Amino acid sequence: EMCIRDRVGTAAVPTIISEYTSPGDVAVNDDETLYSLLTERIARTGNATTIAARKTGPGAWSSITTGEFHRLVLAAAKGLIAFGVGKGDAVTLFSATRFEWGVLDFALAAIGAVNVPVYDTDSAAQAERIINDSGVKLAVTDNRERYDRLDSINDRCPGLQRILMMDGNALGALEGLGVSVSDEELEARIADTHADDLATIVYTSGSTGAPKGVELTHRNFLSVVRAGYECLGEVLCDNHPRLLLFLPLAHCFARFIQYCSIGSDDGVVGYLPDTKSLLPDLRSFKPTYLLGVPRVFEKVYNAASRKAGTGFKGRMFAQAAQCAREWSRTEQDGGKHSCLLYTSDA
């Protein structure tokens, strides 16, 4: 039985609310953090494996090794410390999904700061409410349009001290700022961050009322990541997994799958800011799995259907699509496949 204090007195009054907890299915040590996913991978596999890819043009990618990713994370972390970001301080990332988002996310996690993402489609007024509600002192946007959106509300956000822009080389600016921070100071901050420290505040969409901030610790995310490895190991860990990530990292779902990939032995994340050139990006990156919503897959299907046309190729495409649906239903039901595949020289 729980006891609560009444609003005006000091006496505890009993309630009928009871609280029960049970051990989780996966263990997370008290000193582990989201940053540990990266360092543990490096300890297992070294610095030379590819961990991420950043888009450099339509269908063009630049590979990032674990060593380079780690170097960028530590450099950004030093810059954040030099700026005055302390343990528990809130920093906003107002950006579409991109490589710099991932680097800053791990840098914030390393030093015990709190990532408060703002959805890239949010208005200035929505961003203002989140920034003021969580006490954000530093914001990082991806482009000029979102930078201007925040700049227009800067006077109404008393705690917001500075806005940086990824397209304006925010990572380089932080790296330059961080040269004054010693390795010892950085290591002390990393050592002072623990599993039960706050990692992020994720705000609800606000479709049914004012957005609510949901506080999540490092342990929260690490638990679901490890559960993911147990349940989806063949997808997340086996056969050189490659993830093409385009869902917004402001959502927990995309954050979770990013952490799963970074923490696996040889997973590679391809950060895709938008889906304007999704088909060539799919062909060039060659993902082994995707995280998406129905409209994304509908876009791929409709583009392929239009290209097939209405003649012979169109009929073959329709037959192949029907075959795929039957195959999937049969496999889900645990039965044997009865769908025949046809070839033609026509």
Feature names for model-found ranges:
Residues 222-242, 249-338:
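Conserved AMP-binding/adenylation subdomain of ANL enzymes
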Residues 1-7, 204, 342-346:
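Conserved small/polar residues in nucleotide/adenosyl-binding loops
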Residues 46-49, 165, 179-203, 210, ...:
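Conserved pre-ATP/AMP-binding loop-to-beta segment of ANL
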Residues 63-67, 199-225:
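Conserved AMP-binding A3 loop
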Residues 12-19, 37-64:
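AMP-dependent adenylate-forming
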Residues 51-106, 123-128, 175-178:
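Conserved AMP-binding/adenylate-forming core of the ANL superfamily
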